[in-house]
């Protein structure tokens, strides 16, 4: 709970800075890269979280990794480090992305089907969902043979279940 609150607070401030600098995408990419490195590289994570290692050493490493492209944007990451919030980077990035999606009217949609859709089917689905919601669609497709046929679409908290599995379950209950 506390980490998600920290994520909201930091991401809001970072997003405002990013908008002022017209660096929204670049800052997101830097934060996301830091998060991926933090989550996948145990050595990096232990190094960053180790209280016995001086922050100047940590800053030097972050500068080495992320300072090549834009050292000014690196200050955001260094600030997060100075405040001892690198352990919240996942939440900061997630909340930052939510703000970005909300401001740019982008909607995350997760769809599950029994087989891969063709490019034409994907385009039709995206167009239909975009038309219904009035937003740009970011579609993630998952394959699950257990649903037998049809599909399941998840938009935020809403689930549209048109799977044959659900139909069979409903038929058995009646």
From Swiss-Prot:
GO-annotated molecular function: proton-transporting ATP synthase activity, rotational mechanism
Record has Signal as a keyword: no
UniProt subcellular location: Cell inner membrane
GO biological process, one term: proton motive force-driven ATP synthesis
A Pfam short name: OSCP
Bilayer topology annotation: Peripheral membrane protein
Main location per the UniProt record: membrane
UniProt keywords, alphabetically: ATP synthesis, Cell inner membrane, Cell membrane, CF(1), Hydrogen ion transport, Ion transport, Membrane, Transport
GO cellular component, one term: plasma membrane
HAMAP family listed in its UniProt record: ATP_synth_delta_bact (MF_01416)
Family as reported in the entry's similarity comment: Belongs to the ATPase delta chain family.
Functional description taken from the UniProt entry: F(1)F(0) ATP synthase produces ATP from ADP in the presence of a proton or sodium gradient. F-type ATPases consist of two structural domains, F(1) containing the extramembraneous catalytic core and F(0) containing the membrane proton channel, linked together by a central stalk and a peripheral stalk. During catalysis, ATP synthesis in the catalytic domain of F(1) is coupled via a rotary mechanism of the central stalk subunits to proton translocation. This protein is part of the stalk that links CF(0) to CF(1). It either transmits conformational changes from CF(0) to CF(1) or is implicated in proton conduction.
Subunit-structure text: F-type ATPases have 2 components, F(1) - the catalytic core - and F(0) - the membrane proton channel. F(1) has five subunits: alpha(3), beta(3), gamma(1), delta(1), epsilon(1). F(0) has three main subunits: a(1), b(2) and c(10-14). The alpha and beta chains form an alternating ring which encloses part of the gamma chain. F(1) is attached to F(0) by a central stalk formed by the gamma and epsilon chains, while a peripheral stalk is formed by the delta and b chains.
Protein name, as recorded: ATP synthase subunit delta
Native source species: Fusobacterium nucleatum subsp. nucleatum (strain ATCC 25586 / DSM 15643 / BCRC 10681 / CIP 101130 / JCM 8532 / KCTC 2640 / LMG 13131 / VPI 4355)
């Amino acid at each position: 709970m506390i980490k998600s609150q920290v994520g909201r607070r930091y991401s809001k401030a970072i997003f405002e800075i990013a908008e002022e600098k017209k660096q929204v995408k670049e800052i997101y990419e830097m934060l996301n890269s830091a998060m991926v490195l933090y989550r996948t590289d145990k050595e990096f994570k232990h190094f960053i979280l180790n209280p016995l290692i001086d922050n100047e050493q940590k800053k030097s490493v972050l500068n080495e990794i992320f300072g090549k492209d834009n050292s000014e944007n690196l200050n955001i990451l260094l600030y997060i480090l100075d405040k001892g919030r690198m352990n919240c980077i996942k939440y900061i990035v997630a909340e930052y992305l939510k703000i970005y999606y909300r401001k740019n009217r982008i909607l995350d949609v997760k769809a599950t089907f029994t087989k891969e859709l063709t490019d034409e089917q994907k385009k039709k689905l995206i167009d239909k969902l975009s038309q219904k919601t009035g937003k740009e669609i970011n579609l993630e497709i998952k394959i699950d043979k257990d649903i037998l046929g049809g599909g399941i679409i998840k938009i935020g908290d809403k689930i549209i279940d048109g799977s044959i599995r659900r139909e069979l379950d409903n038929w058995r209950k009646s």
